[in-house]
């Protein structure tokens, strides 16, 4: 790290650190002596609620250093504990033993612990020798459950302004803005300025709990938060800190091969086109396809507008000209190289040799987890090249990769929610649900269902869960509109419970202005009666999908919580590493593989009790691709 004087020289003296105030009515108290620390411990022991926050040198909990910790035990006062970082680790000013005393006091406290974006703070503390095992109330996750469309205003400062009327100090006033190339570390800011800022963060979190809890109760979100979201936080902390192993030599070889193939494909595109153009430019590609080569698609467009060059449109043209499959391959190779093959090595943490993705609980409206830096939930599986990327995800030395994938979880949730007797019976008999659906709508014995019939039934099964219309079915399968209408009619005649549930859900959306998942996660809909028909239809599709996808996401999260507890209680060294929608990946020592296989199957299939059985498929191999 550069010397501090060199960093400070970037600022004029008058603008070095901003003003010495937090913008909040919080009295800061700094722990500087053993007497101060003892008083803080007494307050923790007698507190009903404790809010905490960490100050760090960065925003990546797997790499940053801790600068300090703030705590509030009653409104209006915030304690700040500066941290000293040494070669041996870290310690509070009064000595390293104090950190253990503080950790013990928090974990044995009968108080509610609260934090804003708790996953980050718990992860930072764990990395610095303070594992918080006490349940933690996360005000950010609570706010997201209350209003899933407030994603841009989930930060502590906006919420304090909204709920408390505070105009809090922004961190940029202390460390500068990264976009201006003038940002320093929080470690370099004087204690007299850090303390009030940090104390206010803890105090704001403390007081936000009261502001949010009334809404949590009014909206019936207690089960969602206390049984699903809050217990999941330490599981995600473990997964992020553990990371996933990457086969770097394999990626290096794959990069050379894919890069060579990419160049060859681009040269072939230019040869077929008869000229060089920018394949990555939608405008230039559209001009080549639709004007120069004269390809036509079945859409209406203004004379001056070019049809789309998005993937779904190009797929429709795949057999119309030899340039189209080449363009699709070029796109896939370029994306895989830029997003994974060449990007993953740069994301490997040099201290651990692993990639540490970030799992996000407050992004997807239905409650599904998302991941970022890198996004491991979009690694392709349905193409040869995509599966080759998956081959780079491996176990630790001596370990294997275990994948447990829920079988048709969203359709099982649909059968449960709709209480459809025919669909439930098919699952309870263990039938191939897509073949069973095909037999029902095509009026043929189950044994005589053809692969094509099963494929159509599969599309409608999954499409129903996403609110698909007969028009969409026709577009996605090549059916005529009349055939699609008849197919849907036959489907709903057989599965009348599904039709009834769809209609009830749509009416609820219009009447109540929201729909909810099994554990109460709501998706609100603003007054729909005055909206255009197209907007109402789109809202109906979202309303149908939300309880299905959201409930499935809750089941997966509960399974993750159960698997983690069972692994810990059993003393296993196996670690969960990646979650992709309805699939869990684990890094398993080979000597534990038999026991862990059965443990994971049991915990996933018994995660919740539905009117249909939950089933999971287990695979093991040397890498992610090999488990299938």
List each language-model region with its residue ranges.
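Acidic beta-strand-to-loop metal/phosphate-binding motif
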Residues: 51, 110-118, 401-403
